[in-house]
Amino acid sequence: MASQGTKRSYEQMETGGERQNATEIRASVGRMVGGIGRFYIQMCTELKLSDYEGRLIQNSITIERMILSAFDERRNKYLEEHPSAGKDPKKTGGPIYRRRDGKWMRELILYDKEEIRRIWRQANNGEDATAGLTHLMIWHSNLNDATYQRTRALVRTGMDPRMCSLMQGSTLPRRSGAAGAAVKGVGTMVMELIRMIKRGINDRNFWRGENGRRTRIAYERMCNILKGKFQTAAQRAMMDQVRESRNPGNAEIEDLIFLARSALILRGSVAHKSCLPACVYGLAVASGYDFEREGYSLVGIDPFRLLQNSQVFSLIRPNENPAHKSQLVWMACHSAAFEDLRVSSFIRGTRVVPRGQMSTRGVQIASNENMETMDSSTLELRSRYWAIRTRSGGNTNQQRASAGQISVQPTFSVQRNLPFERATIMAAFTGNTEGRTSDMRTEIIRMMENARPEDVSFQGRGVFELSDEKATNPIVPSFDMSNEGSYFFGDNAEEYDN
């Protein structure tokens, strides 16, 4: 990206640091995941989980959700002011699964939030360690991205369900900070802005008074985050228009939807980080690995290496395919829900199938599901190669548009063409080029028309052997150019419901 110089790296955003050198970044990210690991071990001790139960991904998710809930200030305050029946605002909990006489049992646990916060701080040298909390939020967000499609949410805001590849991070909580903003897709930002504008249209006090001033600041900040994701001058200029509007309304919504569509070809830069379940960090810490001393990166070989040596289990429903369950979690671990399946398959070393062909539901088990028939199996989270995660949209040479498939947001920095159906996308751009943004719209459409699907993105970038930790010998894969590689293609995934 043109303006990369002023940006902090992911890891700095993730750890709340000022500009640091590579070694300091690796150390502070290591400190962050080490803290998560120590917290997890302590929780397993508190709950008296066996080694096997501690490696169960469902137990990991429950423990992660408890700590996130314990630190959710706004919700805690809300719960205390609006007491609801049967909800104790000072307690948090969830299902813990235990192995009893060859069967899995569900046990609902309840803990004081204060106690959970104490354990978390103790594991993090007495600090609140917000970076670690954000890291867990991003892992949950990546899991949701791989598991559910957001068709309904897209349609509700007037966007097209085919824009699902722009929806990375759509389930991240608002409090996820700069690290959270970095991983949000263009569609996610557009949807948040449209919701805001719609509230302003329906509620005339929304932009007024002291509260309205704060709302306005939030609106402009979100516009700037979205602007920073676009890589062409025309798209950025349109974002300036949207941000500066005196009274945001339908014209701004139109502009935002136009921009979201344009991002299918002129892709935005969206960060990708491999965030792993807490139990994986716990296993490593328990085996004596010192993350802070060794250093850690979310975008290099480290997460791949960690997954090579971790054995994680998952509960499996009667008619689910364990291999598909493994694929789902693998994609979540590497933030690869919107990556081209050809690239994912090559890196993973086994064929990655589209969502519609998978026989598996989500990882979490609902409280009304029957435990009698539950089995468990090992998740296969290893990979054949590793590759560097990208934060660019894979557009060829900075300012020019590159081909974008109707549903790919690249995760790995690996050379490939980005096949796309230009006719399908361009059909969405008929008509409306009048109004104050007409010259920008015309310019954007011209760039999109000039994009060629055969253009190669990430020229010369390849994958690496797992023994090649310094990334010295890139292996540039050759892909079947005609093969369309979208995960949500022809899909029947469940909708995401809060």
From Swiss-Prot:
- Spans annotated as Disordered: 1-21
Which Pfam family is one of those matched by this entry?
Flu_NP
Gene Ontology biological process: symbiont entry into host cell; viral penetration into host nucleus
Motif Unconventional nuclear localization signal location, chain numbering = 1-18
Principal place of residence: virion
Is this entry keyworded Ribonucleoprotein? yes
Q: Which InterPro entries match?
A: Flu_NP (IPR002141)
Could you name the Gene Ontology cellular component terms for this entry? helical viral capsid; host cell; host cell nucleus; ribonucleoprotein complex; viral nucleocapsid
* Motif Bipartite nuclear localization signal: where in chain: 198-216
Q: Which GO terms describe its molecular function?
A: RNA binding; structural molecule activity
Modification(s) after translation: Late in virus-infected cells, may be cleaved from a 56-kDa protein to a 53-kDa protein by a cellular caspase. This cleavage might be a marker for the onset of apoptosis in infected cells or have a specific function in virus host interaction.
Q: Which domain of life is it from?
A: Viruses
What are the entry keywords?
Capsid protein, Helical capsid protein, Host nucleus, Host-virus interaction, Ribonucleoprotein, RNA-binding, Viral nucleoprotein, Viral penetration into host nucleus, Virion, Virus entry into host cell
Q: Where in the cell is it found?
A: Virion; Host nucleus
Give the similarity note: Belongs to the influenza viruses nucleoprotein family.
What HAMAP family does the annotation carry?
Answer: INFV_NCAP
Question: What is known about what this protein does?
Answer: Encapsidates the negative strand viral RNA, protecting it from nucleases. The encapsidated genomic RNA is termed the ribonucleoprotein (RNP) and serves as template for transcription and replication. The RNP needs to be localized in the host nucleus to start an infectious cycle, but is too large to diffuse through the nuclear pore complex. NP comprises at least 2 nuclear localization signals that are responsible for the active RNP import into the nucleus through cellular importin alpha/beta pathway.
Q: How does it assemble?
A: Homomultimerizes to form the nucleocapsid. May bind host exportin-1/XPO1. Binds to viral genomic RNA. Protein-RNA contacts are mediated by a combination of electrostatic interactions between positively charged residues and the phosphate backbone and planar interactions between aromatic side chains and bases.
Q: What is this protein called?
A: Nucleoprotein
* Protein source organism: Influenza A virus (strain A/Duck/Manitoba/1/1953 H10N7)
Gene behind this protein: NP
